[in-house]
Amino acid sequence: MALAIALLAFSGAAPALANGKDISFEADTVSVNDEDGSMLAVGNVQMKQAGMTLTADEVRYKRVDDRAVANGNVVFVDADGAIHKSDMMVLDTEFTHIVAETLRSRYPDGSFFIADSGDIKTDSISVFDGSRFSPCDCEFENGETPIWDLRATSTRHNVETSTIIHRNVRMHILNLPILYLPYLAHP
């Protein structure tokens, strides 16, 4: 079912959900609660806006909060092609601010982040806590171990300057810690 049909039934929330930008939306079922201004999309949910795509098993939008909560097999692809996966994500209605727990991100250059939590801002600085980073273009999610990776308590990725800054970082080679640095920055 297309979002246009669901949003016609959801009338007052349509401008808030799309914020004046075109958004396409598909799901197996969509239900609207007129009392609290919420919408629930369940089953094969797919949302597209400004070159970004979100897929999930379920998305709940609350007009009062002006945010969406996606649950189950959540995959967000940003306009640059970075792929972010999690079991749950909270997004603003323009897809520019995403918060997730247990986040796995793969960037177009093949590098990846895995983090206990991530606060992604698609147009500025993203923060990954309990992070693991490697430029290795390997199938990490399928059990392949990178030759080396960096593990940090906190990592900041600045999209504008293409800079990555790690705090309390340990370099691991073949899963063995070999070097500790309180601070490390790289492109």
Predicted regions: what is each one?
Residues 17-187:
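Structural signature for solvent-exposed beta-strand/loop edge elements and short helix-capping sites
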Residues 1-12:
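Bacterial N-terminal signal peptides
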